[in-house]
Structure formats: structure tokens, C-alpha cells
């Protein structure tokens, strides 16, 4: 078993060359330029105003969030890069670097060379990310993890994005009560669990469970709210977007620890550009072997889930019935997504056996 793990690590290290484009000096791109304190953002009369349609300001939400919650993450690992929240700025970094925040309609230059910090309100990817940035940030402020409780936070909402946006904690809670409550629950869990006497293993499992519950509901909310924006993209990009959402269900159920290093490894082989008509993995000439493989596997996972009416995802969730099962699930996903030599049939047979084991435990 140890030999297999060592080989797997060596294979993963080989992906760093591709993944490096998401980072600068080991941190997400734009991280060093993004404001690191609430007081660094524009404010007047004790009201901080955030423009989440600017890449630097949206990245600042994550920088402030990661910094403010780090003291509660000791159970995650021995350094400050182990927090699962690192996965969120890495997602944003990939979307920026791959051109997925650019106006897909071509009607404006938003996100292009002349206006690189602009996040287009027409971008499906930007819309989805909104629910993974603004909502968690406002929830953290409300729960007292960010700020001193005296400064209010306002969020800019462009007229063309008014329906998909909200301007404050009160406004966002009214529009998305269940989602805001789920993220508040995560931050409360973070505070409570970090102060408890349970083992670090148990703390980690509870924190990751609450984190992925928040991220899953954010994605589900975004799926319906952002759906119309998919019409701006090619059919291969739409198919990839749907498969990306489907893959998130597997990652969430396994309680993936989206630390800085883990997130870079898993996001490095995501496609480095928006897909166009005619792109068909695993034979897209200007994408790397790893990118082609990831696109192919994501597509296969989504096709199987569609053909079998959602039963593969349900089966996967059933198989993630214990902390040990989730640990095995994380390793299985790692092999499937990152190792081109790992057979799909092997994945299916192992998953089937894991499901049987869980069924046996529950009877």
C-alpha cells in the first residue's frame, strides 16, 4: 500500500508544472495585490463597500476570510495552508487565468487586456462564483469572524446583475435565507468544534462536512440562478460546466480537504481556456494530456449520471458512509481524475464494493 501511495505522489508532483499557472509565489494569482484587511477596502462613515465584479476585490474577500478563520483551523494540519477555504480562491484564480470571467458575449471588453480586473456579469462562471464568495463572506462578518462588529458591509450590485446580486447581509439573507443560514452554520461549527475536546480527526471531519454542505448549497443555488447565462457559451463549454458541477457532488460527499496544495493539484489539470465548438476531449490539440484526461473523465462521470438518472451520484453518497470510507473515496477520486492509467472499470468495481460494505454496516 505504501508503494502505491508513493507512486501516486510522484505522479501528482508531475502535475505541478501545469498547475503553477494558478499561483504566484505559491499563492493564488492576485493574492498579494488583494487587500488583506476589511479596513483596506473602500469605506465611508463606518460602511465598507465591496465591488465583487472586480477580480482584486473578489479575491480580497477570500484573503480576508482565510486570514480571519485561520486560528480555528489548527486541526486541519500543521501550517496555514491546510484550511479547506483555500479551495475557493484557487477556483477564482483558475477562472481568471482561463478567461472564464471575460464577457462571453463579446459585447464588452470586460476581463480582456484593456480591462483585466473586470468580472463580467454575463459570465456563467462569475455568477456561480458569486455564491461562493459574497455569501460566505457576509455570513462570516455576521458571525463575528471578520471585523469588529461596528463596521457595516455593503456590496455593489450592477444594474445588469441586480436579480442575481444582493447588497448586504440583510438583503442576501432575504433573497437566499437557506444558503446564508448554511454558511452561518459552517462558521459557527468552526468556532464550536475548534474549542471542543474531541480529537483532531473528529474536528476535521465535522469542519469539512459543514464546509461542503455550504459549498454544495451554493452550487445548487447558483445552478438555477445562473442557468440563463449558459446560452452565451459553446456546446462543449456548456457540457464541461455541467460536468464540473456534477464532479463537485463527488468531491463534496468525500469531504475533500481543499487545502492550498490539494486544490492546486486538482485544479491544475482543469482546461486552461474556454472550450469552443469542435473541441472534443481527449483529442484537443492545444490542451495538455492532463487537461484532456480531466475533461474526458468529467464528461464520462456526467454522462453516466445522466443516463442512469442520477444513480451514480446517489451510489457514491451512500458509499461515503464513514470517515474511513470518505478517506478511501478521496483516494479513489484522486486516482480517477489525476492518473490517466487508472481504469474507469476499476473505479466502478471499487465503488460497488464500497457501497456493499456500507450497506452491510447499516443492516
From Swiss-Prot:
Signal peptide: 1-19
Keywords attached to this entry: Developmental protein, Glycoprotein, Secreted, Signal
GO cellular component term of the entry, any: extracellular space
Taxonomic superkingdom: Eukaryota
Cell compartment(s), UniProt: Secreted
Residues glycosylated per entry: 79, 261, 292
Keyword Signal listed: yes
Pfam families, per database record: Leg1
UniProt main location, coarse: secreted
Known function: May be involved in early liver development.
Family assignment from sequence similarity: Belongs to the LEG1 family.
Protein name: Protein LEG1 homolog
Amino acid at each position: 500500500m505504501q508503494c502505491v501511495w508513493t507512486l501516486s505522489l510522484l505522479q501528482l508532483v508531475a502535475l505541478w508544472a501545469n498547475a503553477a499557472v494558478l499561483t504566484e509565489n505559491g499563492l493564488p494569482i492576485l493574492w498579494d495585490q488583494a487587500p488583506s484587511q476589511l479596513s483596506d477596502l473602500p469605506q465611508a462613515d463606518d460602511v465598507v463597500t465591496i465591488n465583487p465584479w472586480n477580480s482584486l476585490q473578489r479575491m480580497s474577500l477570500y484573503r480576508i476570510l482565510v486570514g480571519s478563520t485561520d486560528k480555528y483551523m489548527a486541526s486541519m494540519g500543521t501550517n496555514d495552508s491546510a484550511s479547506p477555504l483555500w479551495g475557493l480562491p484557487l477556483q477564482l484564480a483558475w477562472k481568471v487565468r482561463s478567461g472564464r470571467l471575460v464577457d462571453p458575449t463579446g459585447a464588452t471588453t470586460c476581463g480582456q487586456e484593456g480591462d483585466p480586473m473586470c468580472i463580467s456579469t454575463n459570465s456563467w462562471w462569475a455568477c456561480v462564483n458569486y455564491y461562493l464568495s459574497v455569501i460566505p463572506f457576509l455570513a462570516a462578518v455576521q458571525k463575528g469572524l471578520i471585523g469588529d462588529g461596528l463596521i457595516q458591509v455593503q456590496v455593489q450590485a450592477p444594474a445588469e446583475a441586480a436579480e442575481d446580486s444582493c447588497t448586504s447581509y440583510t438583503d442576501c439573507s432575504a433573497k437566499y435565507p437557506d444558503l446564508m443560514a448554511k454558511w452561518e452554520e459552517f462558521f459557527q461549527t468552526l468556532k464550536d468544534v475548534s474549542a471542543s475536546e474531541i480529537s483532531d480527526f473528529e474536528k476535521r471531519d465535522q469542519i469539512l462536512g459543514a464546509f461542503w454542505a455550504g459549498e454544495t448549497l451554493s452550487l445548487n443555488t447558483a445552478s438555477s440562478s445562473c442557468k440563463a447565462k449558459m446560452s452565451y457559451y459553446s456546446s462543449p463549454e456548456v457540457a464541461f460546466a455541467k460536468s464540473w458541477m456534477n464532479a463537485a457532488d463527488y468531491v463534496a460527499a468525500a469531504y475533500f480537504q481543499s487545502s492550498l496544495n490539494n486544490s492546486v493539484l486538482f485544479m491544475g489539470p482543469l482546461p486552461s481556456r474556454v472550450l469552443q465548438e469542435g473541441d472534443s476531449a481527449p483529442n484537443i490539440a492545444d490542451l495538455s494530456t492532463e487537461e484532456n484526461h480531466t475533461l474526458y473523465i468529467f464528461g464520462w462521470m456526467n454522462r453516466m449520471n445522466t443516463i442512469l438518472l442520477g444513480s451514480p451520484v446517489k451510489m457514491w453518497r451512500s458509499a461515503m458512509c464513514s470517515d474511513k470510507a470518505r478517506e478511501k473515496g478521496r483516494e479513489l477520486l484522486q486516482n480517477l481524475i489525476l492518473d490517466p492509467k487508472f481504469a474507469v472499470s476499476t473505479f466502478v468495481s471499487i465503488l460497488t464494493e464500497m457501497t456493499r460494505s456500507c450497506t452491510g454496516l447499516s443492516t
